[in-house]
């Protein structure tokens, strides 16, 4: 009911250098990474798709729990891979992280009520918002102000990206591979284990009861009826209208975890041109590890 997820990731290599010395391979990598994670309750979409007729009465609210975690940061890593023998290789990649921007929205208790007699829609609102960026946010006082700053990301220069005085984090990747014979091998690894500490944050903690939200939600209903659905606009409208686009304030430092991934892989190679691979992974999303299994064939 509360555990629906949308996840997107983007990575751009800016610089990569490497060399080999005997059984040791060393590489330096500088990349820019973006990841976003949205999680929402079943009622969040069901309310718009099925209407509010299923949520009549104060004892039958629509659960509007929703959250987001979006981060943009650069990563400098030094990779070391060592071949112990013909069968076993190990590797480690420590990383320094420099955060550009983060937005975290946590809401676990917002409820939408529909009066069974008047059909007036009200909300009990509970939201926690925190955000940080290397941009100047002295003039940011609301959600709208903060959102507009993200359109200025293309003005960031390299001096700001490499500013190691704020939004610093550390991470590590490590793993090993073992080849049993010419046909069969396995590998295991842990990727993106680490955190970023964000400074100069903006925060908002909003708890309100009986907020009238008819206008905000009816506009979104009309968009759905016209098949004019923009999830970004829908999400923004809810934040501004349901959770209120009022003041946000200066906050303290906070940490966010990287999206850690644990991987176990095995392959069977019939010929150099024919391989079957199985990959089992655990992704860390919304404070839980989520399993995934991939089967691949190449030939």
Task: Give the positions of each predicted feature.
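Subset of outer-membrane beta-barrel
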Residues: 1-299
